[in-house]
A protein has these predicted regions:
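Bacterial N-terminal signal peptides
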Residues: 6-16
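Extracellular carbohydrate-recognition regions
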Residues: 17-41, 123-129
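Extracellular beta-strand elements of beta-rich domains used
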Residues: 23, 210, 229-232
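Short carbohydrate-recognition loop motifs
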Residues: 48-69
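Extracellular/lumenal carbohydrate-interaction signature centered on repeated Trp-anchored short motifs
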Residues: 73-83, 176-179, 203-204
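Solvent-exposed strand-to-loop "edge" motifs in beta-rich extracellular domains
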Residues: 86-92, 115-117, 190
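Extracellular/luminal beta-rich ligand-recognition
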Residues: 105, 109, 115-163
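Extracellular beta-strand ligand-recognition surfaces/modules
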Residues: 108-110, 164-175, 179-220, 224
């Protein structure tokens, strides 16, 4: 999903939570769990977002065909803890290119949204954010990390999104070798935040939401992603 303003909007009507509602608590075919909302980008065909059964467990399914979409959940918590999830894809997006606008497509994405002080960004990005919030509302997050399943770049590759230097893309899976298999992930949110936006802002920032989805609107390809429950684990 290319980060064009609408992709980052979290539902203003949703009360921010401290824990993420699980997909596995719902029946296949039911509406998304309370707190989750489907997000689509204006003027781009919407991906199919649904709850489906996989190996006896209800998971999130996102199917895209020259389209884009995700499910988002609003949060309000400090930049700390470990984000854990599992995901599966049917194929990679063959023509994707993570640092080019024409190739900004991924078989699966997981976003973490942040509220970061304005002085973390150059004036050009501050101006874009101000305009975006005037157009789309104050709920537009100021920054995000986007964990992706890429087609070819090595795991660990990190780059600014080609549409915004407020969004850092991090490759956590790459290639088709693990396609059609569930893969477990864990990310240290504080460490990833510091790597993307700097140590100085971690204590003054908040996590404002997460999202899971995929997109093929740039390349015109087709891909399906499945996501198990997403959770933020904190040390006891």
């Amino acid at each position: 999903m290319a980060v064009r303003a609408g992709a980052l909007i979290l539902a203003a009507a949703l009360a921010a939570a401290s824990a993420v509602a699980p997909f596995s608590s719902m029946a296949p075919g039911a509406a998304l769990p309370e707190g989750w909302r489907a997000l689509h980008i204006a003027r781009i065909a919407p991906s199919e977002i649904s709850l489906a059964a996989d190996e006896g467990v209800t998971v999130l399914r996102v199917h895209s065909h020259a389209s884009a979409g995700s499910a988002a959940f609003a949060l309000d918590r400090p930049v700390a803890g470990t984000l854990a999830w599992r995901w599966k894809i049917d194929r990679v997006v063959a023509k994707a290119e993570l640092d080019e606008k024409h190739g900004d497509d991924f078989a699966a994405r997981v976003y973490v949204f942040f509220d970061i002080p304005d002085d973390a960004f150059p004036w050009t990005e501050r101006l874009r954010l101000k305009i975006g919030r005037l157009l789309y509302g104050a709920e537009l997050p100021s920054a995000a990390i986007c964990y992706v399943w890429d087609n070819s770049h090595p795991v660990g590759t990190s780059a600014w999104n080609p549409y915004s230097r407020r969004v850092r893309t991090v490759v956590v899976e790459s290639g088709a070798a693990q396609a059609a298999r569930w893969v477990d992930e864990k990310r240290d949110l504080a460490a990833d935040f510091r790597a993307a936006f700097g140590e100085a802002f971690a204590g003054r920032s908040r996590i404002t939401g997460i999202a899971a989805g995929n997109d093929t609107d740039q390349t015109g390809e087709e891909a399906t992603a499945w996501f198990g429950d997403l959770r933020i684990e904190t040390p006891r």
